[in-house]
Amino acid sequence: MKQIVTVTLNHICPMVTGVTPHVGGPIIGPGCPGVLVDGTPVSLMGDACVCCGPPDMIAQGYPGVMVDGIPVVVQNCMTAHGGVISAGVPGVVIGSATPIKPITMNIRKIPFPKIRTVDSVGAAVTGNSKKMKEAKNNIAELKKETSGQTPMIYNLRWETEGVRLYSDRIDEGTKMVADVTNIPDGDTVKISVLIDEDNRIVKQFEGTVKNGTVEIDWDILSKHFKKEE
């Protein structure tokens, strides 16, 4: 069982830039404002964290619970800098009898830090070599996870000119967009649109993966979703 993580909780970052250890900092979200624990939004995979230098990003999530198609964050999920979220909200846990591994974002979407020679030297000079090694090992583990996990399509949404739609109104020019994990760029994915309890297929779409995302022109207007008598 894992504790659910919310925005404002801290992550711990072992990365070192120059002679400055990152230490870590709070998750700044955006999280999901519509799903709250103790009045605070739950954190989602891809959320940003305060860290030394550029913000860090949560690169993992729990595939068994999704909000708006995005996995929620639980304790021990890792970040792009090689950090980890060591604890969530006490008493708010999810999981099953059989442990489920977290999923990792597409490697193209993870902003891994560039580790320079001066950073390794700075870590040694300041006595932070052990922390730097931990960060490197965690980053290597993230990269390994992205190639070894089951292919997955998630975060399916509709967009118009790059803006996510939350309305049930479907106009021309709308695109169906989804993120993928462990599906190489250039591969074709198929998405079936279902409409009712009988799983009637309205249409099957095909799209090509590019930069860890598939984008498809949505040519089904609202009239297609009226149930046939």
Label the predicted regions.
Residues D179-D185:
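Short solvent-exposed strand-capping/beta-turn motif centered on an Asx-Ser/Thr pair
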Residues M1-Q149:
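Intrinsically disordered, low-complexity proline/glycine-rich segments
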Residues V177, T213-E228:
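Exposed aromatic-hydrophobic patches
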Residues D187-Q204:
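Extended low-complexity, serine/threonine- and proline-enriched intrinsically disordered segments
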Residues E172-M176:
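Structural beta-strand segments of beta-rich domains
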